[in-house]
A protein has these predicted regions:
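RNA pseudouridine synthases
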Residues: 1-133, 138-148, 156-157
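Pseudouridine synthases involved in rRNA/tRNA modification
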Residues: 1-21, 30-33, 145, 158, ...
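N-terminal hydrophobic or amphipathic segments with adjacent small-residue motifs
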Residues: 23, 74, 106, 134-138, ...
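A structural micro-motif recognizing beta-strand termini
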Residues: 111, 165-168
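Long C-terminal interaction/binding lobes of large macromolecular proteins
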Residues: 151
Length: 226
């Protein structure tokens, strides 16, 4: 009964939980984890999905060492399905070969009307020196990482297109950068050249993965809020 009550007090839904992983439906506006600018004490008080889950697992016991471990991240303004590990070993299991062990699809509303019904972007991405933005750079650039984004059109309107995106790699801001550089930034993505909107129109729709204990394929989904 206690765990049920605590789930209701969370600001998001727990989609699945066992002794190895915990899968949530993250709302837009919630940080995945703390920012580097905060000290340790402040980081523990910062409102993040990670801290909320730590509190949930500890059930109010201040001396408890139960915690979650990062496996991947969603940008603060991106909503949808994401997973945390319940041990360092499970975290390392996924992070050692994330792209092979998982599959992710997103839904995005992008500015303008895309004429093609489907396509793919491929480039090498690199963070700027301050880490704030990411951009495509020539192959062979130091610290650049290859990124591939496959997409298909779901619907079109007068001023925007809704696309389903299949990530073939998981780089920082990958979807946002690739669509911005194509001339169709994600609606609301002011950081990458879009007009201001009520939110960033990017949602992690599904996450599938091989379970770390038995290899069984598991898949979780979240309805798009737009």
């Amino acid at each position: 009964m206690e765990s049920i009550k605590r789930k209701k007090r969370l600001s998001f839904e727990i989609l699945y939980e066992d002794k190895f992983v915990i899968v949530i439906d993250k709302p837009a506006g919630l940080l995945t984890t703390h920012t580097k600018l905060w000290g340790r004490a402040a980081r523990e008080e910062q409102m993040t999905a990670e801290n909320c889950l730590n509190d949930y697992l500890r059930k109010g016991q201040a001396k408890s060492r139960l915690r979650v471990w990062l496996v991947h991240r969603l940008d603060r303004e991106t909503s949808g399905v994401m997973m945390f590990a319940k041990s360092e070993e499970v975290s390392e299991f996924f992070r050692s070969d994330w792209n092979r062990l998982t599959a992710k699809t997103y839904v995005a509303r992008v500015e303008g009307v895309i004429a093609e019904d489907s396509g793919a972007f491929e480039s090498f991405l690199k963070e700027d020196a301050d880490g704030y933005k990411v951009r495509s750079v020539p192959e062979g650039t130091n610290r650049a990482k290859k990124a591939r984004t496959k997409w298909r059109v779901l619907s079109r309107a007068k001023n925007y297109t809704v696309v389903e995106v299949d990530l073939k790699s998981g780089r920082k801001n990958q979807i946002r950068v690739h669509f911005s550089e194509s001339g169709h930034p994600v609606v609301g993505d002011v950081k990458y050249g879009a007009n201001k909107a009520s939110r960033l129109f990017l949602h992690a729709k599904t996450l599938a993965f091989s379970h770390p204990a038995n290899g069984r394929k598991m898949e979780f989904s979240s309805n798009s809020p737009f």
